[in-house]
């Protein structure tokens, strides 16, 4: 049975206390709406998102990554509430899966299990450790009797710990029949989607409660819950990669972005941060290193190294306090305390301590190209644009501002001066 998916993302999200819309808040470097859209498009090609607050901003991000998404706008003034979000929604398929845009931890397998039930109305519920302000679900004889919003619950109903996860699977024809019957006769004067349960019950529709994991189906309303969710997602990301063979030393101290990829045998030490679309292939990342949108293959990085965006390392050693940016290094050793930016360095080259590629002239960036088997002495500055041919020796302390031909020794130092007995003249009388 084909499914249309509707994601509710029109709320103001005032408790998140941010100028950025709630659904654009990031977990593991990806906004929560993108996390849920990835799961949605894995299940259906008919996916719609309901927006209102900062619609243009949210729509732009959604369509950048998921251009086939249908965008709907909720009229919050005339049709507030979760049921009001469905006005104007026309599903293309036999049933509808309704999701919340602030629920990024939901797994595709859990949604598949929810869709696997053939009841006309399925409701995701969970046993809450602390029910807080969740809507309470009253179940009788394995069928949902009603959902009571916390604002409208009486004292007895507030004692119930079975709560509404806010995820529904409903027959499209049933939805079309019941939606116009929902009213706003409640404390908040809103149109509640939860009322669809009461209306379905009045028509003797069997409503199936499907129990799900509370942590996985948590909604995010403030920055504290955002941090809890990100921590939960980090554990899942690292667990997945460890099951694929990656070794993490002290994994609770590392951060791995949602789009990071590991291939082969990799090892990650404590306090490492790997971001963006970085790809680590058969490599070791040592303590307290940061890698951003870079590819590391058959290499070791760190400790205390920083690979900024667009670095490509192959068969290379990057040591402590080395920073690279937009650098392609193939079979290179850069052991310590260097900046290698906007450069290409070829195989067999050794970069001495204190080497800097001076890539910025105050207006634009320039490139340094270093060939094969080059020995770069300590405290060398390359003034880009500059090209060093193969098999060159750069003497320590040199400032290189011209191209250097193959096989040459380059030395550029100020003249030496030594004043005999100067110490005694200065400090002894």
Swiss-Prot record:
Residues annotated for acetyl-CoA binding in this entry: 359-360, 378, 396, 413
Active site residues according to the UniProt entry: 336
GO cellular component: cytoplasm; membrane
Physiological role: Catalyzes the last two sequential reactions in the de novo biosynthetic pathway for UDP-N-acetylglucosamine (UDP-GlcNAc). The C-terminal domain catalyzes the transfer of acetyl group from acetyl coenzyme A to glucosamine-1-phosphate (GlcN-1-P) to produce N-acetylglucosamine-1-phosphate (GlcNAc-1-P), which is converted into UDP-GlcNAc by the transfer of uridine 5-monophosphate (from uridine 5-triphosphate), a reaction catalyzed by the N-terminal domain.
Organism: Campylobacter jejuni subsp. jejuni serotype O:2 (strain ATCC 700819 / NCTC 11168)
Subcellular location: Cytoplasm
Complex formation: Homotrimer.
Binding site for Mg(2+): 102, 221
Reaction catalyzed: alpha-D-glucosamine 1-phosphate + acetyl-CoA = N-acetyl-alpha-D-glucosamine 1-phosphate + CoA + H(+); N-acetyl-alpha-D-glucosamine 1-phosphate + UTP + H(+) = UDP-N-acetyl-alpha-D-glucosamine + diphosphate
GO biological process, one term: regulation of cell shape
Gene Ontology MF terms in the entry: glucosamine-1-phosphate N-acetyltransferase activity; magnesium ion binding; UDP-N-acetylglucosamine diphosphorylase activity
Name of the gene encoding the protein in the UniProt record: glmU
Stated name of the protein: Bifunctional protein GlmU
Cofactor note: Binds 1 Mg(2+) ion per subunit.
One Pfam family here: Hexapep
Protein's UniProt keywords contain Acyltransferase: yes
Keywords for this protein: Acyltransferase, Cell shape, Cell wall biogenesis/degradation, Cytoplasm, Magnesium, Metal-binding, Multifunctional enzyme, Nucleotidyltransferase, Peptidoglycan synthesis, Repeat, Transferase
